[in-house]
Amino acid sequence: MFGKLLPCAILVWCLFSLGQARQEETVEECERNIPASLKGRVCELRQYTPVQGKDMDSHMQCVLEVLGFVEDNGELVFQELLGVLKMVDPDGDHASSMKKCNAEAEKVDTSSKANTFYTCFLGTSSAQAFKYAVDYVELLRAGKLDMGTTFNAGQVSALMKQIDDGLCN
């Protein structure tokens, strides 16, 4: 059991360390500071609806950066995201999806990299694992789950439903 908790704790600590460069520290803060053109679409965006444009580029940079999945220049933090994806879905071939989408993101301007990666990744076989990974780390960073909490799909889904219902109903 200790052998499973230690890598999880180390990964979560790394994710928290990476997300410290921004003013925002949680997805909630990114949503609070969302560009005006997206303010009325927060509920839609929380359901993983890809949106194009500079405002969404900025928002996804914020979200993925506070989660520790991209650097402040939009570059993918490959091992961090892969580690969470493997916790969520140990059997998935997430690395190939990540490589494909990272290659797409490398073709665009720095300001669009995070959103390009996000949009691409939602079209891969790893999309569900990615959604769970984002939700799981969002809950950890927001203090809704304790740092040592191992991934549980039912628990993550229930907590995200509570948050979404509170915001969107």
Swiss-Prot record:
GO cellular component, as recorded: extracellular space
Places the protein is found: Secreted
Keyword Secreted listed: yes
A single MF term (Gene Ontology): odorant binding
Residues the entry annotates as binding histamine: 118, 135, 138
Gene3D superfamilies the UniProt entry points to: Pheromone/general odorant binding protein domain
GO BP annotation list: vasodilation
Binding-site residues for noradrenaline, renumbered to this chain: 31, 46, 135, 138
Chief localisation class: secreted
Disulfide bond found in the keyword field: yes
First and last residue of the signal peptide: 1-21
Protein name per the record: Short form salivary protein D7R3
Gene name of this polypeptide: D7r3
